[in-house]
Amino acid sequence: MRLEDLRPTPGAMKKRKRVGRGPGSGHGKTSGRGHKGQKARGSGKVHIWFEGGQTPLQRRLPKRGFKNINKKVYAVVNVKVLEERFEANEEVTPEKLIERKIIKDLKDGVKILGDGELTKPLVVKAHAFSKSAVEKIESAGGKAEVI
């Protein structure tokens, strides 16, 4: 076998379709677009959401709800995470939570939730607490302070 003997696998090199190049090509005159109509025209594309003139789905369905621009979005932390990542009598602040990569950013503040158990007394400073989180922090001998 020599370099000049190399040939592409049959079917690997597909010929380019040259449309509008006479009747002998098989793609002449109308260039494979058929006769007249929207799709035969230059800019005759239909959007993927076009439903043939019937009222589109997004207009058939009723309007519902709204997005509250004043809603607070908290970065949430569960009590079990505080148990794992902090020592007894340590102070937990939003800055320390970011520093230890427990949360990415503050958003509208930090909310402590009550999933898991807490055995160490901790001084937790956050923007909001759930009732169960406050109970667990205080029963472990710690303090829950709202910033």
Swiss-Prot record:
Record carries keyword Membrane: no
Organism superkingdom: Bacteria
Q: Which SUPFAM superfamilies match?
A: Ribosomal proteins L15p and L18e (SSF52080)
Instruction: State where composition is biased (Basic residues).
Output: 30-44
Q: Which Pfam families match?
A: Ribosomal_L27A (PF00828)
Q: Extract the coiled-coil ranges from the record.
A: none
Write down the Gene3D superfamilies for this protein, in alphabetical order: 3.100.10.10
Q: Where is this region: Disordered?
A: 1-46
Molecular function (GO) terms for this protein are: rRNA binding; structural constituent of ribosome
Instruction: Tell me which family the UniProt entry assigns to this protein.
Output: Belongs to the universal ribosomal protein uL15 family.
Q: Kindly state the subunit structure of this protein.
A: Part of the 50S ribosomal subunit.
Q: What does this protein do?
A: Binds to the 23S rRNA.
Protein's UniProt name = Large ribosomal subunit protein uL15
What is the originating organism of this protein? Thermotoga maritima (strain ATCC 43589 / DSM 3109 / JCM 10099 / NBRC 100826 / MSB8)
Q: Which gene encodes it?
A: rplO
